[in-house]
Amino acid sequence: VATRARAQSDDKSHHACVYCFARPSHRYLELDAGVDFDRQIIVKINVADALRKDLARPSWSREHVALGTNTDPYQRAEGRYRLMPGIIRALADSGTPLSILTKGSLLRRDLPLLAEARKQAPVDLALSIAIADDELQQAIEPGTPTTQARLATVTAAAEAGFDVAVFMMPILPFLTDSEEHLDAALGRIKAAGATSVTYTALHLRPGVKEWYAQWLHAHRPDLVGRYRDLYGDGAYAPKEYRRWLAARIKPLIAAHGLERTPEDPNTGTVASRANARDDEGEWRRTRAYGDDAPAPRAEPLTLF
């Protein structure tokens, strides 16, 4: 991905998504990756001032800055602290391209500001919408806005003139990977006004796997054995599953007209997210410059 830097206004997430890959980073604050991650939110109240200082450095060459690559910039705490407007203004004033990925419908508050920022620097917006089943969505993403609220945010952003991408991440094996679910989700996303969809299968790194396994035992014990087969010895679903998923979802994405345009309209170059896919067409996250959490140990876990 053509992204060098990441800015965050807070650490950890009131969204409490069971599958969140950022959970292990809470351990570096001497907090756990489960309940503490969901309830103990660290707010960086001076983030806009600190960012302006960084952007003023002679060494800063206006690389693309991604907001929302680790934890969500528009979770509930943002409604109180209003940190994102200062971040957006700082980036725009310096001519720094920015992108925002969020589950938060609070993004709508800042659409006028983002429209103004786009006059000074490229702005890329994306909503994370992975689950079309409302009951499942509230069970596994209990602190997030509903799927319909996020789709309404897609519509609002599109009406404000943005090309809005949707990240269907993660696709949950045996829960959201059926053709019926995928087709219904893509239909709603298209109707909302999104222009493209990017997807990936569930990734269970150490620290996340334990929490997800606990949820699975409580809510879907019938799937424990099947998850053991997929994730018992590693963090990623086997290549065979990912290839199967690609063969199922890519034709559906194309049928709904949601394939990502290979050229970025802001720069005239290949879109960065188009470069961020593996051989099976899945999105792969690259480590952003400035990430403060070291990579977890690659050790097998047998929790399912």
Predicted segments, located by residue:
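A structural motif
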Residues: G95-T96, F162, A194
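Auxiliary Fe-S-binding modules of radical SAM enzymes
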Residues: D177-F304
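Short beta-strand segments at enzyme active-site cores
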Residues: A66, L101, V164-M168, V197-A201
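Active-site glycine- and acidic-residue-rich loops that bind
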Residues: S105-R108, L172-D183
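Surface-exposed amphipathic alpha-helices with a cationic face
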Residues: A115-R118, V154-E159, K250, A254
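Conserved strand-turn element in the central/C-terminal portion of the radical SAM core barrel
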Residues: A132-D134, E141-G143, A156-S178, L202-L204
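Conserved Radical SAM active-site core
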Residues: V1-D11, V18-A126, A130-Q138, T147, ...
